Every structure is written in C-alpha cells, then in structure tokens.
C-alpha cells in the first residue's frame, strides 16, 4: 500500500505484494476510520467496509460539501439523522456512526463488501463500492496489524510534531490493551498480542501527515526512513526491540518522530 502527495512532496506507501497508494491526508483518515473499528472491537472486515465506503464517497477526504446536505468522509446527511454538520465533520464521530449502522444488518459479515457498504449508504450507484475493495482490504489488513511490515513512507516535510501527537490515534484505539510510554521523541507500545502492537505502530506511521517520523520497530524487525526511496522493513540490528525474545511473552514496537 502506498500513499503520495506530489504537491507537498510527501509520500506514504504500503506494499502487500503490490503497491496500494494513499496520500498523507487519505492515510490519516484511513487510520482514524480503522482505529474506530478497533476501539469498538470489530473485526478487520468492518474496517475494510468502512474504508471502501469512504473511498467511494469522498476519496478519503473530510470534505465539507456534497450532494444536497451530504458532508464528510461518508457523505452523511444531517437531514437524515446522521448528526449535526459539526459532528459529521469529526472523522471519529462519522466513523462511529457508520459502524453503528453497519452492525444493525445481521448479514454484514457474509455479504460482499460492496453490498455491506450499500446497505448502509443506500446509494443511487449500488455497485460503485466494488472497485475500491482491493485497496480498502489491503489498508485495513495493515492498519489492524494483520499484515506485518506492510507500511512504509517517504516524508520530506520540514514540519515536525511531537510523538504524542503522532500516537494519539493509536492510543485512542488500543488503550488499555496496549501500554504506551513516551521517552523523548520515541513512543513505545507494549502488549502480549503482536497483532495489537503492529496495529499501534501502523496507525502511528499512517499519521505522518502530522509530522515526519525517523524510524520504527516491531519485535525483531525495524524500519528507518529514507528521504529518497521507500524503505523496507528488515531484521533489527543488535538486540531485539522486543522483550518477547527473552521469553516474557510481551512484544514491543516503537516509533520515533523526526526531531
């Protein structure tokens, strides 16, 4: 999977056999949409359905316009009971409203992703979601931690932010199952489930629109930013980044913000 933004010369990429691209704004919104599914304890399929929907409705952009009074990532309408305009423009709120409606359908886990999206949206173009399914499934798998070492990025921005800000989405999604500790520019995520640690790192990396990162680790794998190329994940140099290697049962991951 990858994301790119030529205008700002800032890129993000994820590879799962092939490239799936999103730009930084899109990947940030994808992280929030996926994080809300994790927070609610929903399976990865729910995130894939929501991402498919937002890709079709808004191209994963939190737009303040649309058909009639439609707004936001999912083009929800205040006049149809989705919430106030201010609420709908909050990606966390709009994602939560989408999932709340999705799970009302008893067959949402068995019908196609396109059809599940259509049940919620009731679009005049009922097959329009289908073309987004491969991209949405790839990102959902990576951001929920089910596709290891999948996310990479290039960020040439000169802007910086705190690692606390970068990790905010992951913390909201995964606390208290994943412990978080900040030391200087580095946030460390620790849990007994490696999938959750991978999700925390991926959600933080997908938030790079807030500021660039320098490096990341998950257990015995590591990644370091390259200003010219999409860096690959590889074996961590030196001692393992994870206490699990010494038999404690705990797994750690880190993300370090560029300072």
Predicted features along the sequence, with ranges:
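Short, functionally critical alpha-helical segments immediately adjacent to catalytic or ligand/cofactor-binding
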Residues: 34, 44-60, 119-121
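Flexible, glycine-rich surface segments
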Residues: 151-199
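Catalytic and binding regions of secreted/periplasmic enzymes and modules that target cell-wall glycans
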Residues: 93-162, 183-187, 216-221, 246, ...
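Peptidoglycan-targeting cell-wall enzymes and recognition modules
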Residues: 13-21, 58-113, 117-125
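Extracellularly exposed regions in secreted/surface proteins, prominently low-complexity, repeat-rich
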Residues: 139-149, 206-259
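Solvent-exposed, acidic/flexible segments
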Residues: 22-26, 30, 42-46, 66, ...
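Extracytoplasmic/secreted envelope proteins and their assembly/folding machinery
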Residues: 27-34, 47-50, 73, 92-99, ...
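Single conserved hydrophobic/aromatic residue that forms the stacking wall/gate
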Residues: 1-7, 11
């Amino acid at each position: 999977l990858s994301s790119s933004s030529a205008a700002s010369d800032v890129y993000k990429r994820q590879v799962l056999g092939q490239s799936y691209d999103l730009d930084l704004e899109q990947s940030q919104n994808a992280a929030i949409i996926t994080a809300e599914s994790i927070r609610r304890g929903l399976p990865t399929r729910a995130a894939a359905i929501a991402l498919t929907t937002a890709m079709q409705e808004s191209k994963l952009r939190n737009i303040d316009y649309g058909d009639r009074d439609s707004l936001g990532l999912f083009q929800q309408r205040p006049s149809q009971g989705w919430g106030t305009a201010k609420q709908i423009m909050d990606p966390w709120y709009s994602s939560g409203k989408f999932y709340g409606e999705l799970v009302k359908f008893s067959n949402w886990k068995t019908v196609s992703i396109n059809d599940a999206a259509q049940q919620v949206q009731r679009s005049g173009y009922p097959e329009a979601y289908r073309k987004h399914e491969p991209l949405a499934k790839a990102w959902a798998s990576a951001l929920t931690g089910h596709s290891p070492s999948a996310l990479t990025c290039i960020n040439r921005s000169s802007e910086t932010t705190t690692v606390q800000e970068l990790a905010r989405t992951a913390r909201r999604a995964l606390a208290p199952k994943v412990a978080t500790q900040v030391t200087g520019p580095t946030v460390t995520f620790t849990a007994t489930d490696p999938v959750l640690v991978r999700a925390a790192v991926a959600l933080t990396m997908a938030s790079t629109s807030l500021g660039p990162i320098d490096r990341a680790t998950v257990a015995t794998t590591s990644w370091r930013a390259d200003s010219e190329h999409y860096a690959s994940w590889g074996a961590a140099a030196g001692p393992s980044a994870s206490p699990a290697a010494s038999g404690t049962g705990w797994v750690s991951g880190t993300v370090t913000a560029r300072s």
